[in-house]
Amino acid sequence: MKRPGRKREKDNGHEGRSSSSGLSSSRNFESTALPGDVQHADLSLVPPDPTPSPRLSEPAESFHMDMFAGPLTPLDSFLSPGLSGMRDCLTELLATPINFSELGLIDPILSNFAQEQHEIACLFGSDGASTDPDLLSGQSQLEFNLSPRPSSSGDQSLAEGGPKCSDKSKCHAICGCMMRALNLINTLFSSRASSSTSSSSSGFPRDSASGSTPTRPDSLLEALLAENRESMEIVHTILKCECGEMTYLIPMLSIAVVKVLERYALTARELAGDLGLDGKYKDPDRPFNSSVDDDHSSGRTTAQLILNELHRVQGAVNLVERLLKEDSLEDCVRRGQQCPVSSSPVAFSPTTVHQMNTDLRRRLTTLSSEIINILRQS
């Protein structure tokens, strides 16, 4: 005897079929139901047979995206009706033009933005030329930057005579005193003139023939004197400039003057050692020796040349002292008061600058005394 439930279980096992197959299985269930209690079952358990809804009538495969679709397949075919409607609303919102006058009602700050001109065409005239004053000022600035620079002869004249500037804060950009001072210090500390003079056997020439007149100093001494002379001329030119960088330049130039004095002092001490003086006066009872007297005559000439060059160093020291007095730096240091700070950047304290000036004058006085002593003993 066949059981009617077998057919129902078989029909309900196919879940992947469409909804129409499911409805047909329900009809078969009604026709094959057993009489008796099964037929008197509650009719509410039997699914009704109304007109199927659109969602249930769609095939099940429409709810799944084809993973093997081509890359050019439009995405709209996979969107549900709800997502498609949201996309249409977003597109309409972005395509709507913005009314800036309405933004002013929301925020007062945005009202100013609505009144301004935001079109590029209004910045240009009919011929395509710019009419914006900001652009015109930028164009004139560009023409100024591309203007030809002064010739080298003009720069040389500024370097030689020193510029006269009404605005001291801008003068240093024209004269270049800071760069010249740095180059001077580099030249003095890297030059081999002093070392070449010290390595020579004598700072002055010796004549082989006895009784001959002293000749000119040798080439090494001439090179030393010429280089020191040129260095002191640069120092004088920078000190006479009216730029606003003197608080930096005075200490740097003081270092340069110290280096020049050191060269002169080294030559003078070598001269005294070669003459055998060692700070002592010449013995008048010493027997006459023509060669020794010739050496003393040549040494006297060299000492006189060095002494004549010291007036340049004396002038530079006087200029530095005058500049310090003009700024009232030296007076406040002597009184022990707090010195005023100038408007320009101060590289060293006034006390340090005053001490450097005092050291310069002491070195100059000591060197002058040594050379005068050589002249007296020779």
From Swiss-Prot:
Instruction: Tell where it localizes.
Output: Nucleus
Matching InterPro entries: AflR
- Renumbered to this chain, the Basic and acidic residues biased-composition regions fall at 8-17
For this UniProt entry, the molecular function terms from Gene Ontology, in alphabetical order, are: DNA binding; metal ion binding
Specify residue ranges for compositional bias: Polar residues. 143-156
Q: Where is this region: Disordered?
A: 1-59, 143-167, 195-217
Where is there biased composition of kind Low complexity? Answer: 18-27, 195-212
**Which cysteine pairs make disulfide bonds?**
none
Q: What GO terms fall under cellular component here?
A: nucleus
User: What are the alphabetically sorted keywords of the record?
Assistant: DNA-binding, Metal-binding, Nucleus, Transcription, Transcription regulation
The job of this chain, per UniProt, is described as:
Transcriptional regulator; part of the gene cluster that mediates the biosynthesis of the tetrahydroxanthone dimer neosartorin, which exhibits antibacterial activity.
The name on file for this protein is Transcriptional regulator nsrA
Ranked from the top, the taxonomy reads: Eukaryota, Fungi, Dikarya, Ascomycota, Pezizomycotina
Q: Quote the gene name from the UniProt entry.
A: nsrA
